[in-house]
Amino acid sequence: MFTDRNEAGKLLSEKLADLKGENCLVLAIPRGGVVIGNQIALSLGCKLDVVISKKINPPNHPEYAIGAIMPDGTVHWNQDMSQYLEHAYFVNEINEKKNEAQRQLEQFRGNSRYDLKDKTVILTDDGIATGATVFVILKWLAKNNPKKIVVASPVIPASTYEQLKKTSDQVIALLLPTEFYAVSEFYKKFDQVSEKEVESILKNFR
C-alpha cells in the first residue's frame, strides 16, 4: 500500500530509471495521474504533459467503464457495443464525454497539437482498472509515431497488465493484484486532486 500519490510516483520512477537520457515525454492522465507523472518527469529530467480520455459508462453505473473516448473522437470499447450505439442513452453519453474531454484539453493544454515523433512516451495514471482510458490513448498514440510507448502505473490488475503488454512496448507496475476492486484501496491517502493543482504542476513544465 502507498502512503499517497507522491510516494507512489517516486517509487515508480525508480523502476523507470533506465529511460533517463532518452528522448522522453511523460503523458499523464488527469487528475491523479498528473501527480504521479510529476514525480516521474522530475526524476528522469523530461517534460510532463497531459493526455485526456473519458470513461463511457452504462446507465446507472458511473464507476464502471465499458469504453472511453478522446477529444478527437477516438473510441475504445471493452466489449462489442455495436448493437447499442444508436440507443439514445449512448448517443448522449458519447457526445457528453467527448465534449468533457475537449473542455479539459482546452483548460489544461490550450490546444490539441502533440509532437510525439521519435519520442519515448511514458503514459501514466495513479492506477489502472479496466484499462479503458488507457487503451483508447494507446490507439491514439499509435497514429502519432512515437519511438516507444511505456505504460507505467503504481497498480494494475494482473489481467489488465497482460492485455496492456499486447498493445505497448513495455508495461511497468509496482503492484499487480489478482483481486482488484478500486484504485483507492491501494493508497492510505487518496484525496481528489483539484484542477488547480493539476494546472500548478503543469506550469512548472511550460
Regions found by a protein language model. Give the residues of each.
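PRPP-associated nucleotide enzymes
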Residues: 1-206
